[in-house]
Swiss-Prot record:
GO BP term (any one): cortical microtubule organization
Source species of the chain: Arabidopsis thaliana (Mouse-ear cress)
This protein's record includes keyword Nucleus: yes
The protein's name in its UniProt record: Mitogen-activated protein kinase 18
Record family assignment: Belongs to the protein kinase superfamily. CMGC Ser/Thr protein kinase family. MAP kinase subfamily.
UniProt domain Protein kinase: residue ranges: 25-316
Length: 615
């Protein structure tokens, strides 16, 4: 299956270019595997921080799994809290209609509470208190949003070496809205039995409350105190036996509220059990901690405290101030309207795609305005990550560290370059004057940035060329998109609005004859709110300026201002241009560097022309 994924991804990767996120994340190692897919640790090269990238395979193979993923990504977007894991991004798929896998970028947590408990038998009372405090803070935030997690357990609480905990895995979570009863019932509850509240064992109650999460937190905290699960039941009956062995036989009024006939009969006929004192069960624990634990593990859900009430317990004196603990706004009913209707795979794909766009604001804006193309051919990083994930999956079982594949090219080379008309606003002409010449910065091997002989030998005045802006791509590679995007904007603009290309252009030497290599790339400067400046004609040398123009240039506050000239040859915006460096050098009094600057001005309102060199 992995080989098929590689073959399928090879063709798609040919269409991905550098201005996506393909180079943003550098894969380090596989840190987890499961039926859903793989989790890898990676470095975000933009910020330098470590992240976890979760690859979820075949999202839409089963509708129930797809709904669980949709529910989780939606809730994690809505529940932003320091004690809840954060989704940093979701990678944009290559196709809106046909994508099957998704890549979710999380903040990286080194371990989970299950591993912490298993590996540490020397946790202090301060550890116990801080762990419970963080879990209750997260639970308070969720419950104020009317969200029930329903699957709290140590493996679903991530941990760092600095004792920071974060709740994760909201796939089974549900939202209760104001127009529904305070107690709700969902038939698909399949949470881990060991941390399941007694009212859920055997479907005892037809309805249940957020107190089910409070019970789970109590079970987790007891495991933190002792280092082993509190109620490791092997079946529903065994689970009830373990619970009643510690808590004693429930009250008769509690048993009368049981809806399941068999369960009610089992509890009624159960021999009388007395509760075990918690100080005897947890002899080394803080007495204040045990008093709170006994409240969390009340058999009757009505006797359990809310998370806010638990945070106000004397156990957290000096640590918790309930008034400063954040609360969540209630979630809009429209966010989860999909839970009330029958959905097809295409419906869920559209909903998940909409969630992905929440992490790509410009594309979300286009989607909401209806200007997005139906086929969704935006650049994507999925191909790049698919290759790395597949490589790590195939080699993770071998001995020794797995070295991830490195990207061979910074961008995909092309054999031909096409120009595309991009209508732009008028730009001020920043071409050089006769007193200022443009000097190209030579590369290490003595060639210009385009890979041709350097023109830096031409003398320059004390006032140098306009300040360079770091280019968005290496010289000689494609740094602008040749694909038109809706109303004339580039696809690159939709991703990196702040990216500015290098303020110079490339030209070929006199020996080049291939017409495909005569195209140049003309970078645009930021627009200035001035009157439009007439363009130079490529057939008329810059020497056509008059003495009056020279005076105007000298008196203008902008040292790079080019005076207006008579319009001699209006170029059609649809014309594909190629600048002959030899002709410009012969006709221009500025030399090759000046000719290049004139070429920039000549292309100001014509469009973006891309240049490519083989890698």
């Amino acid at each position: 299956m992995q080989q098929n994924q590689v073959k399928k991804g090879t063709k798609e990767m040919e269409f991905f270019t550098e201005y996506g996120d393909a180079n943003r994340y550098r894969i380090l190692e596989v840190i987890g595997k499961g039926s859903y897919g793989v989790v890898c640790a990676a470095i975000d090269t933009h910020t330098g921080e470590k992240v976890a990238i979760k690859k979820i395979n075949d999202v839409f193979e089963h509708i129930s799994d797809a709904l669980r993923i949709l529910r989780e990504v939606k809730l994690l977007r809505l529940l932003r809290h320091p004690d809840i894991v954060e989704i940093k991004s979701i990678m944009l798929p290559p196709s809106k209609r046909e994508f099957k896998d998704i890549y979710v970028v999380f903040e990286l947590m080194e371990s989970d509470l299950h591993q912490v408990i298993k590996a540490n038998d020397d946790l202090t009372r301060e550890h116990h208190q801080f762990f419970l405090y963080q879990m209750l803070r997260a639970l308070k935030f969720m419950h104020t949003a009317n969200v029930y997690h329903r699957d709290l357990k140590p493996k679903n609480i991530l941990a760092n070496a600095n004792c920071k905990l974060k709740v994760c895995d909201f796939g089974l979570a549900r939202v209760a809205f104001n127009d529904t009863p305070t107690t709700v019932f969902w038939t698909d509850y399949v949470a881990t039995r060991w941390y399941r509240a007694p009212e859920l064992c055997g479907s005892f109650f037809s309805k249940y409350t957020p107190a089910i999460d409070v019970w789970s937190i109590g079970c987790i905290f007891a495991e933190v105190l002792t280092g082993k699960p509190l109620f490791p039941g092997k079946s529903v009956v065994h689970q009830l036996e373990l619970i009643t062995d510690l808590l004693g036989t429930p009250k008769s009024e509690t048993i009368s509220g049981v809806r399941n006939d068999k369960a009610r009969k089992y509890l009624t006929e159960m021999r009388k059990k007395n509760p075990v004192t918690f100080s005897q069960k947890f002899s080394k624990a803080d007495p204040l901690a045990l008093r709170l634990l006994q409240r969390l593990l009340a058999f009757d859900p009505k006797d359990r405290p809310t998370p806010a009430e638990a945070l106000a317990d004397p156990y957290f004196k000096g640590l918790s101030k309930i008034e400063r603990e954040p609360s969540s706004q209630q979630i809009s009913k429209m966010e989860f309207e999909f839970e009330r209707r029958r959905l097809t795979k295409d419906d869920i794909r559209e909903l998940i795609y909409r969630e992905i766009l929440e992490y790509h604001p410009q594309l979300l804006k286009d989607y909401m305005s209806g200007s997005e193309g139906s086929n969704f051919v935006y650049p994507s990083a999925i191909g790049h990550l698919r290759q790395q994930f597949t490589y790590l999956e195939e080699n993770s079982s071998r001995n020794g560290p797995v070295i991830p594949l490195e990207r061979k090219h910074a961008s995909l080379p092309r054999s031909t370059v096409h120009s595309t008309v991009v209508h732009s606003t008028s730009q001020p002409n920043l071409g050089a004057t006769d007193s200022r010449r443009v000097s190209f910065e030579p590369s290490k091997n003595g060639a210009s940035s385009a890979g041709h002989p350097s023109t830096s030998a031409y003398p320059t005045k004390s006032i140098g060329p306009p300040p360079r802006v770091p280019p968005s791509g290496r010289p000689g590679r494609v740094v602008e998109s040749s694909v038109s995007y809706e109303n004339g904007r580039n696809l690159k603009e939709a991703y990196f609005r702040s990216a500015v290309s290098s303020p110079h252009c490339y030209f070929r030497p006199n020996t080049m004859t291939n017409p495909e290599n005569r195209n140049i790339e003309a970078s645009s400067f930021p627009p200035k709110p001035q009157n439009p400046v007439h363009q130079f004609s490529p057939t008329e040398p810059p020497a056509a300026t008059t003495n009056q123009a020279d005076v105007e240039t000298m008196n203008h506050p902008n040292p790079y201002f080019q005076p207006q000239l008579p319009k001699t040859d209006q170029l059609n915006n649809n014309t594909h241009m190629a600048i002959d460096a030899k002709l410009l050098q012969a006709q221009s009094q500025f030399g090759p560097a000046g000719a290049a600057a004139v070429a920039v001005a000549a292309h100001r309102n014509i469009g973006t022309i891309s240049y490519s060199a083989a890698s």
